Structure formats: C-alpha cells, structure tokens
Amino acid sequence: MSRSIWKGPFVDGYLLKKADAARASGRNETIKIWSRRSTILPQFVGLTFGVYNGAKHVPVYVSEDMVGHKFGEFSPTRTYYGHAADKKSKRR
C-alpha cells in the first residue's frame, strides 16, 4: 500500500540540509547518505548521492526520472551469482 497523499513524501531532515549545502557550495561532491528509505525530491536532481548498501556507498546520480522513487531502489544490497549448474548436465 502506498503512502497517503496528505502526509507528503518522507525525507530525513538532515538530507535536505546536506542537499541545500551542496547546491550552495557549487561543488560536485558525492553526498554520503544512509537513509535508503527517503524519497527523491525534485530539488535533488543533478546531485550525486552515495547510498549505503550495507557494505559500501554506491554512487547514484539523480535524474528527473528518479523523482518519487526511494534511494534504496538504486543501491542493491544483495549480489546475484546465478543459479548453481546441474552436475549431471556438465558431464556430457
């Protein structure tokens, strides 16, 4: 079930402050964040965020298409190695 409209999008407060500071400084630095649950807002477009996936910060450049999604969607936490091969079929 999606979030009700009257509540508005969820964004951690410190994230807004960091984004405003990055825009004011004009530098193109990666902003390290741990808040995977925060919604991407239009004011984040053009900034690069380092979204923590449990092991490292994955760089995510925010584009207009990402607005409304969560940061965690763009930083996978699990590594997929593929399905194990069947030993019988390998012998042939």
From Swiss-Prot:
GO MF entries: rRNA binding; structural constituent of ribosome
UniProt entry tagged with the keyword rRNA processing: no
Alphabetical list of Pfam families matching this protein: Ribosomal_S19
InterPro entries with a match to the protein in the record: Ribosomal_uS19, Ribosomal_uS19_bac-type, Ribosomal_uS19_SF
Example of a GO cellular component annotation carried by this entry: cytoplasm
Keywords carried by this UniProt record: Ribonucleoprotein, Ribosomal protein, RNA-binding, rRNA-binding
Disulfide cross-links: none
Primary role: Protein S19 forms a complex with S13 that binds strongly to the 16S ribosomal RNA.
The name this protein goes by in its record: Small ribosomal subunit protein uS19
Organism of origin: Azorhizobium caulinodans (strain ATCC 43989 / DSM 5975 / JCM 20966 / LMG 6465 / NBRC 14845 / NCIMB 13405 / ORS 571)
